[in-house]
Structures are given as C-alpha cells and as structure tokens.
C-alpha cells in the first residue's frame, strides 16, 4: 500500500502528497496514521504533482503537516447483511452503540453503480401505512419513493418515526434508517422509540449528525443506501428512511465551497442535480427485490421553489407536504391534502371507489378554502344552504384527517391508532354522503375509525 504525507490542512480539506507513480484514484479511502482517533479521508481531486485533495470523514482537529497517510486502494467500505440489524453505525460502518464489534459477513464499497435498465422492475402494489391522510390522498407504492416536505417543526421526523413503527410491525420487513445531519437528540429518541416498539432487531441505523464534518454528512446517506442494497439483492423488500435529504444537499454545498467550486443559484453547488441523481438513481427496485424509500425533506423558509426541494421533487412517486397552517390549527399529522400528490392515485391502481373518495374529499376542502374569504368578511349567515353544508362537512373532514400516533402517545395522551385503508375510505365516504351531518365536528378530532367518532360524539 502506497503511503503519502499531509502537506496542508484547511478545516475539513486535507491535501496529501504521494509518489508520482502511486497517486490514489478519486473516491479512494486514505487512513491517517498517528491521528488521535481513526481518521479516514476520501480523495476528491487530483491536483497534479502527486498531490490529492481530500475531504475528512471525521474531525481534522490535531492534524499536522508531515503526518503519514496510507492509501487503502479502495473506496470506503461498510459492513452489510444481517449483522448490521439492531446496531447504530457511523459513516464508516463502525459501531457507535457500545455493543462491541459487528460480526461482518462482508463489506461493500459505498460508491456503486445504479442497476441497469434491464434489471429494473416497477410495482403497482400499495404499501398500507395505517395513517389515514397518507393512505387516502397520497398512497405509497411498494418500491416507490416518498418525500415528506415541511419547514422547521411541522412534524417530519415524528411522521417518519410513526411510518417506521407501523410498517415494521405490520410489514415485518427489514428497514435501514440513515440519519443525515439531524440532531443527536432525535437520533437518541429514535433509538429508544425503536427499542420500546420492539422493532430494533429489524432496523439498521446509520447516523451522521449535525456536529459532524461535511464529508461525513455527504457520505452517510450512501452508507445507509449500500446496506439497503444488500438486503434488496438478497431478494427482500426493504425500507430505506432518510432524514434529512436537505442536509445531504447542504453538506454537498459545504464540500463544494471547500473545494473551491463556483456556487450556482442561491449558493448551492453547481453539481446539485447530479449529486441528487447519483443517490436517487440507486434507490430503486430490481427483479430480485425492492427498496421503498421515505425521505424527509426540509424546506428552507417554507419555500418549495428553493433549488434543493425542487430538485428532490423530480425523483419522487409521492409527495407528502406538511403545512405550518394546518399544524397551527392543532391538526396532526399536519399533511396538506390539497398540496400532497401521488402517482398511484389513479383508478387503474387504487380502484374507482378510492379514487372518487380521495378526489371528493379534495374538492370539498378546495371549496371550503374558496369560501373562507367570504366567511371572514360577511360571516357564515350570508352563505347559501348548499355552501353551509359544504363548510360543515369540510370542517369534519379536516378534523377526521387528524389521527393519534403511537410514537406521540406521550404528547397527545391518547393511544395510537392504525387505520386500515378499507376503514379510511368507508369513513370519508360516509362524511361526504352526509351520514354524519348530525354529529358535532369535535367528535372527528384525533380519532381512528369513524365508529370512534360516533362513540366520541355520545360523550360530548
């Protein structure tokens, strides 16, 4: 193995000089000898004269010029397979949960080619989440990609935790969770939530938190994806959760700036679309198995036209948009039923009844939205009888779209509910048809099935 020496350190960027005939390839991993903790560098550029520019995967504090660096002659490799289940790992696949070493079956490089066109497969099967608003308005496809879009504090992580809990228990498959640049506290909560729900032994957790250097946050999504690809290639249906794709983009922006590239729109890296494509094109289903991915996407300043969320939109099958306005009404999950969409919401896929109910719910809510201005200026009394009925049903539908979560029982004080798709469609169809016009709207708030709303109305 060739060895070189550090000639320059600027924050997370480290320049290493190698002999002219042994220059490492781009994306090769290098290990620093003599660093206080294990430190791996990834080659990003060859500058000529035997010098390579690298990004550090850990803190570069304490590095000095002249330190010896070994070329490992392969990209970063991480353990894959069943031994990773129930464990928390970092970007290098090293365990960080104090439970001893991972019994490695094999290691795969994190940089891999996307499957070829001939190997790809698509599925029309629906993945039932047990969350009414998602199953009704933006159904998830097995092997599809779902984005949870929302600004700060509207519930992306809580929604994701609920999805993992529901799908892991009801779906009994394996899941991989990649925490990309999120809070360490959330990672901790997440771990304990998985333990309490008894699903930890079905989940591999890979964390690269907010306090990590940008190189680490840029690569941790690929580490999680590589583990998911292994399960897929064994013929399984695996779930990949990424929280948060925006931090992946942001890490790319930081790395790009550190490497001296010219920024593009809003200061993002010029390679934004390509970097997003490299990740997203690998998250796909083949003839052997499927990867269904759920990705949280932070929306800066609630602006969906920002280049980062806008680039992500293009890759998704379903988009779940979380709205601050709905959250402010106390309706959780704060999904905007008029802004959320799914490619699966087609009568040929979900059936005519589901399609009609979903579109009916949307049209009633849309009409209510239009009438809000009139109500604000003139009051309810000025509306026609038909419009009064629309408003009354819309407010019931709005409340019935809320639901108590298992992972939020501590906050809501009510037990979580898993609602089957059949019950969801039946409930909304009943409200639209006027079967429950006599019930007060409070009865529909934070309940599971329509029967629970009827029971709640008796107590009011």
Swiss-Prot record:
Q: Name one Pfam family in it.
A: ATP-synt_ab
The name this protein goes by in its record: ATP synthase subunit beta
Q: Which GO terms describe its molecular function?
A: ATP binding; ATP hydrolysis activity; proton-transporting ATP synthase activity, rotational mechanism
User: What Gene3D superfamilies does the entry give?
Assistant: 2.40.10.170, Bovine Mitochondrial F1-atpase, Atp Synthase Beta Chain, Chain D, domain 3, P-loop containing nucleotide triphosphate hydrolases
Q: What organism does this protein naturally occur in?
A: Yersinia enterocolitica serotype O:8 / biotype 1B (strain NCTC 13174 / 8081)
Q: Name one GO cellular component term.
A: proton-transporting ATP synthase complex
Where in the cell?
Cell inner membrane
User: Tell me, how does this one assemble?
Assistant: F-type ATPases have 2 components, CF(1) - the catalytic core - and CF(0) - the membrane proton channel. CF(1) has five subunits: alpha(3), beta(3), gamma(1), delta(1), epsilon(1). CF(0) has three main subunits: a(1), b(2) and c(9-12). The alpha and beta chains form an alternating ring which encloses part of the gamma chain. CF(1) is attached to CF(0) by a central stalk formed by the gamma and epsilon chains, while a peripheral stalk is formed by the delta and b chains.
């Amino acid at each position: 193995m060739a060895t070189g020496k550090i000639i320059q350190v600027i924050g997370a960027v480290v320049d290493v000089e190698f002999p002219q005939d042994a220059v490492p390839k781009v994306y090769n991993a290098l290990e620093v000898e003599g660093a206080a903790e294990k430190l791996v560098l990834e080659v990003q550029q060859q500058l000529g004269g035997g010098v390579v520019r690298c990004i550090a995967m850990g803190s570069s504090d304490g590095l000095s010029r002249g330190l010896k660096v070994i070329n490992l002659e392969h990209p970063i490799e991480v353990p894959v397979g069943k031994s990773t289940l129930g464990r928390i790992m970092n970007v290098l696949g090293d365990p960080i949960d104090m439970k001893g070493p991972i019994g490695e079956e094999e290691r795969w490089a994190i940089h891999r080619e996307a499957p070829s066109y001939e190997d790809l497969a698509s599925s029309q099967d629906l993945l039932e989440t047990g969350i009414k608003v998602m199953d009704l308005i933006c159904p998830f496809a097995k092997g599809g990609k779902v984005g949870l879009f929302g600004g700060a504090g509207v519930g992306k992580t809580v929604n994701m935790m609920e999805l993992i809990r529901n799908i892991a228990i009801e779906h009994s498959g394996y899941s991989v969770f990649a925490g990309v640049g999120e809070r360490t506290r959330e990672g901790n909560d997440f771990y304990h939530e998985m333990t309490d729900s008894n699903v930890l032994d079905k989940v591999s957790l890979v964390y690269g938190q907010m306090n990590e250097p940008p190189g680490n946050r840029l690569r941790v999504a690929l580490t999680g994806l590589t583990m998911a690809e292994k399960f897929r290639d064994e013929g399984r249906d695996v779930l990949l959760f990424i929280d948060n794709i925006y931090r992946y983009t942001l890490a790319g922006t930081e790395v790009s700036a550190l490497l001296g590239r010219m920024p593009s729109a809003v200061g993002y890296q010029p390679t934004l679309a390509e970097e997003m494509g490299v990740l997203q094109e690998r998250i796909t289903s083949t003839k052997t198995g499927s990867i269904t991915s759920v990705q949280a996407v932070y929306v800066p300043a609630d602006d969906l036209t920002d280049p980062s969320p806008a680039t992500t939109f293009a890759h998704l099958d379903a988009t779940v948009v979380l709205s601050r306005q709905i959250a402010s009404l106390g309706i959780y999950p704060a999904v905007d039923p008029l802004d959320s969409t799914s490619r699966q919401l087609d009568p040929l896929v979900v059936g005519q009844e589901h399609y009609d109910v979903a579109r009916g719910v949307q049209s009633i809510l849309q009409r209510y939205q239009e009438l809000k201005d009139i109500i604000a200026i003139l009051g309810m009394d000025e509306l026609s009888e038909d419009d009064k009925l629309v408003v009354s049903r819309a407010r019931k539908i709005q409340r019935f779209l809320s639901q108590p979560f298992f992972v939020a029982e501590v906050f809501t004080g009510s037990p979580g509910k898993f609602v089957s798709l059949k019950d969801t469609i039946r409930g909304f169809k009943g409200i639209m048809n006027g079967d429950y016009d006599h019930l007060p709207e409070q009865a529909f708030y934070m309940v599971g099935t329509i029967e629970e709303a009827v029971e709640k109305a008796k107590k009011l």
